[in-house]
């Protein structure tokens, strides 16, 4: 077919039946110029190279990122109860259009960090009631900045049952 591409993966040795191959010490080249690859080291480590440089290194001890990693900031929908997802919106912001309740973030993973910026609208002086799933220092939820168009930033760590506050900027 016109414009069709043919991909060839060359693996030494016989290939038959299910594709179960030992790639120990092998490098799988993922692009035409050979600078993007997966390499299965012999020391329980997998290197992912992009542009000829290590991008990520996975090992039994840890995962190493050679470049910055981030979650794009999601904009939450303002509503009487503000909903958000720890799995798809771990970094979020919302602009308050009235006094609101912040619902518990859905689908969290134990040990996960999440962050939210709560912004006052042009009127200001909006309040937020936090769901009981959020736990603050001294067991007291903070009072938000009342200034119009200003915001407060909160960071939480999920412990399996509660979102424990680990930082704030008011």
Language-model features: locations:
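Surface-exposed interaction regions enriched in Ser/Thr/Asp/Glu
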Residues: 1-19
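Residue-level detector of short, conserved catalytic/binding motifs and their immediate flanks
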Residues: 4, 36, 46, 112, ...
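Exposed extracellular interaction/assembly regions and N-terminal maturation sites
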Residues: 64-135, 150-170
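Terminal beta-strand-rich extracellular "head" domains
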Residues: 133-147
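Residue-level "contact hotspot" at macromolecular interaction interfaces
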Residues: 1-2, 107, 145
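Tight coil/turn sites that cap or link beta-strands
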Residues: 2-3, 149-151
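Beta-strand-rich receptor-binding modules of extracellular spikes/adhesins
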Residues: 19-67
């Amino acid at each position: 077919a016109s414009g069709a591409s043919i991909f060839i993966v060359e693996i030494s040795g016989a290939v038959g039946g299910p594709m179960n191959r030992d790639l120990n010490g092998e490098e799988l080249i993922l692009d035409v110029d050979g600078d993007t690859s997966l390499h299965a080291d012999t020391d329980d480590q997998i290197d992912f190279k992009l542009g000829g440089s290590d991008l990520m290194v996975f090992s039994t001890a840890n995962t190493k990122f050679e470049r910055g990693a981030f979650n794009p900031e999601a904009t939450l929908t303002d509503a009487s109860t503000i909903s958000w997802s720890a799995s798809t919106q771990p970094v979020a912001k919302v602009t308050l259009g009235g006094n609101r309740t912040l619902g518990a973030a859905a689908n969290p993973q134990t040990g996960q960090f999440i962050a939210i910026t709560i912004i006052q609208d042009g009127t200001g002086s909006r309040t937020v009631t936090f769901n009981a799933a959020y736990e603050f220092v001294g067991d007291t939820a903070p009072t938000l900045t009342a200034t119009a168009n200003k915001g407060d930033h909160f960071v939480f760590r999920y412990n399996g049952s509660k979102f424990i506050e680990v930082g704030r900027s008011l």
